[in-house]
Amino acid sequence: IIIGGGHNNAYPIIKGVSKGLLKADKVPLAQINCINLDAHTDYRPLEGRHSGNAFRYAETDGFMGKYAVVGLHENYIPQNVLTDLNNNPFIQYTSYEEIFVHERKNFIQAVAHATGFTEDTFTGIELDMDVVENVLSSACSPSGLSVLHARQYLNFTATDCKVAYLHICEGAAQIADDGAKNEEAGKLISFFVTDFVKANSNVIPPNSI
């Protein structure tokens, strides 16, 4: 379980976990899948590593096999990235608008689609705090998922996936530039972690991995 920092850290996490699972003879090659609950793709071009392209680097370097994203905001997807997503058979995504505006599927169906898409191997579970409405983060949004949706996502993925890791990122207790504060950020993350741990413990016996 990794907490804090930017989503640029997803790349070394994916790389390290993949190589560790290979060394432990849990996988045939150093590669895992990822599910990301995020308002952004973090799949921008290879232009030097930053928080907006960690998953592109992980895929390019062979450490990430399949990538599923839930909750994308369509307004935040550049056309070149959207084209790449649609042309890549190893990527699956469901936008926020598909779920909550157009109601083409419900939230749990979207998460289940992601877990089914990535079920062939160990999967890293990612949660970017900016996906939750009005939570203080690096990219706070007035329109987004509820805290309950985020908790349901963590409960479902912990139960349904062969979990490689959990990464909760981009949240903030205070923004240095404007002084904005959220003294409940730590408490919110503690709910996320305990939901995930309790759900995963019910599925995987201790010391089984």
Regions found by a protein language model. Give the residues of each.
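Conserved alpha-helical scaffold segments that buttress catalytic/binding sites
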Residues: 1-209
